[in-house]
Every structure is written in structure tokens, then in C-alpha cells.
Swiss-Prot record:
Top-rank lineage group of the source organism: Eukaryota
GO terms classed as biological process: cytidine to uridine editing; mitochondrial mRNA modification; mRNA processing; response to cold
InterPro entries assigned to the protein according to its UniProt record, in alphabetical order: Nucleotide-bd_a/b_plait_sf (IPR012677), RBD_domain_sf (IPR035979), RRM2_NsCP33-like (IPR048289), RRM_dom (IPR000504), SLIRP/GR-RBP-like (IPR052462)
One of the record's GO molecular function terms: copper ion binding
This protein's name: Glycine-rich RNA-binding protein 3, mitochondrial
Subunit structure: Homodimer. Interacts with ORRM2 and MORF8/RIP1. Interacts with RBG5/ORRM4. Binds to RBG2/ORRM5.
Induction info: Up-regulated by cold stress.
Family: Belongs to the GR-RBP family.
Provenance organism: Arabidopsis thaliana
Disruption phenotype: No visible phenotype under normal growth conditions, but mutant plants exhibit severe editing defects in mitochondrial transcripts.
Length: 309
């Protein structure tokens, strides 16, 4: 039994090796067939909107046998979007069509004819062409694409360095260096941009922020220490209407000096207080009441002295 099992394993390994060798030998021909298929398919851009698949086939049939034609339509309106595809039976026919029609007038418009690549690659529709991944209209390097194009990550409204991008250096981007960006150095940014978190206009180091700026509660700010409504400014602890050093404070009018222990209406050295008019040592006080008219010179101790004399 063990011998049979071992023999079966050896036979299985041998069969797998033979199959792998056959697949490796046939792979170049398979890849070549795929390459030929892709090189025989063309992308046509800038087409007249009046062209349909029949008119497209008619225009390209003179350069070789056409297998398939396709005009890309808008999903909502059903109208042509201005580009399409033509597939030939051979790459030679496709090459002839490119040489004859690329940059030429077709039904009143100058068309762009090139090899059609996959959507993920570059150079054709979906790659370097309209709406593709890199360098084309809506691609990663084209208009509205991911990098460097109109609306791309490095282009107008793109993600990095573009006008309105969301990375750095773009107008309205949210990273660094962009006008209105959320990172550092941009107008309205978080770090050193105006209106951001630090050092900018309205930020923590800018106007109306939390530190060293106007309108905030930290130091050296308007409304902070030493400014209006701050702890050392108007209405603060040492200013007008505050508790120390200002009007209506503890040492000001209405505070401790005036109307307090050393002012009018106070306890010790003021009018109507002790030691002043109406106080303990003044008219009507308890200490001088014995020398008034009731117990004055007539009928007092002086009369007794006269009688004794």
C-alpha cells in the first residue's frame, strides 16, 4: 500500500511538470494574440456628433476589414459623446487607418485616431485619452483627472498643487501653501495661513484668536490682558470700572478709596464718621455733652465756687 501511494505521488508530480511546460510554451503565442487584438482596436476622438456606427464603419472600411464599430453615447440624452472605437482584423489595417486619418477632417471635424488601450493603462481611451487614468481629458494627468490635469490632483481643482486642489499649493486646497488651504502657509489655512489655527488672520496667532492677537482672551490682545475688556484693560481688574487701579475699582471712585475706608461716608476719617463732623469727637458727640447749656457755667460747678468764696 505504501509503495502504491508513493508511486501515485511521483506520477502526479510528473504530470504537473509536463502541464506547466506546455502552458509556458503556449504563453508567448497567447500574449501575442492579445497584443495583436489590442493593436487592431482604435480610439477615435473629436468625432462629429452626427456620426453613428454605420458612418464610422464606412469611413474606416477603406483601410481594412472592420470587425466592430462603437460610438459612445450619453446615458441620459442618448446622443453621441464625440468619440468611439473601431476594431480591425489586423494590426496592419489599424496602423494604416491611423496614418491616414489622425489629425484629419472627418465629417467636418478634426479627429484624433490612436490605438485603444485598457482603461487602467496609459495612452488611449481611459489611459492617456478622454476620461482616462493619466494625461487625458478627465484622466489622472488630464482635465478633471487625478494628477496634473484640469481638476486632477496636480491640475485645476485637483488634489495636489492644482487650482482648488485638496493637497498642497493649490488655490483653495486644504493642505499647505494653497490659497484657503487647511494646512500651513495658505490663506485661511490651519497653520500659518490667514484664518487658520496658528499665525494667520483669525487664527490662534491672528486676529480674533486665542493668543497674542486682537479680540482674544490671552496676552497682548485686544480684549486680553492689557486691552479693552481684558484683565488689565478697560473694564478689567486694574482699569476703569475694575477692582484695582481703575475708576469704580477698589482704589477708585465708588471703590475702597472713595466711599470706603478713606473716603466720603467711610468709617474713620470721613464726614459723619468717627473723628469728623457728627462723629465721636465732633458736635453732638458723647464726650462734649457735659459742656452744653444744660450743664453750662450758670448753675454748674462755677456757682459752687462763688458761694464758697
Amino acid at each position: 500500500m505504501a509503495f502504491l501511494s508513493k508511486f501515485g505521488n511521483i506520477l502526479k508530480q510528473t504530470t504537473n511538470k509536463q502541464l506547466n511546460a506546455q502552458v509556458s510554451l503556449s504563453s508567448p503565442s497567447l500574449f501575442q494574440a492579445i497584443r495583436c487584438m489590442s493593436s487592431s482596436k482604435l480610439f477615435i476622438g473629436g468625432m462629429a456628433y452626427s456620426m453613428d456606427e454605420d458612418s464610422l464603419r464606412e469611413a474606416f472600411t477603406k483601410y481594412g476589414e472592420v470587425v466592430d464599430t462603437r460610438v459612445i453615447l450619453d446615458r441620459e440624452t442618448g446622443r453621441s459623446r464625440g468619440f468611439g472605437f473601431v476594431t480591425f482584423t489586423s494590426s496592419e489595417a489599424a496602423s494604416s487607418a491611423i496614418q491616414a486619418l489622425d489629425g484629419r477632417d472627418l465629417h467636418g471635424r478634426v479627429v484624433k485616431v490612436n490605438y485603444a488601450n485598457d482603461r487602467t493603462s496609459g495612452g488611449g481611451f481611459g489611459g492617456g485619452g478622454y476620461g482616462g487614468g493619466g494625461g487625458g481629458y478627465g484622466g489622472s494627468g488630464g482635465y478633471g483627472g487625478g494628477a496634473g490635469g484640469y481638476g486632477g490632483s496636480g491640475g485645476y481643482g485637483g488634489g495636489a498643487g492644482g487650482y482648488g486642489g485638496n493637497s498642497g499649493g493649490g488655490y483653495g486646497g486644504n493642505a499647505a501653501g494653497g490659497y484657503g488651504g487647511s494646512g500651513a502657509g495658505g490663506y485661511g489655512g490651519d497653520a500659518t495661513g490667514h484664518g487658520g489655527a496658528g499665525g494667520g488672520y483669525g487664527s490662534s496667532g491672528g486676529f480674533g484668536s486665542s493668543g497674542n492677537t486682537y479680540g482674544e482672551g490671552s496676552s497682548a490682545s485686544a480684549g486680553a490682558v492689557g486691552d479693552y475688556n481684558g484683565s488689565s484693560g478697560y473694564g478689567s481688574a486694574n482699569t476703569y470700572g475694575s477692582s484695582n487701579g481703575g475708576f469704580a475699582g477698589d482704589s477708585q471712585f465708588g471703590g475702597s478709596p472713595v466711599g470706603n475706608s478713606s473716603q466720603f461716608g467711610g468709617d474713620n476719617t470721613q464726614f459723619t464718621a468717627g473723628g469728623q463732623f457728627g462723629g465721636e469727637d465732633q458736635f453732638g458727640s458723647m464726650e462734649k455733652s457735659e459742656t452744653k447749656m444744660e450743664d453750662g457755667p450758670i448753675g454748674g460747678e462755677f456757682e459752687d465756687v462763688a458761694k464758697r468764696a
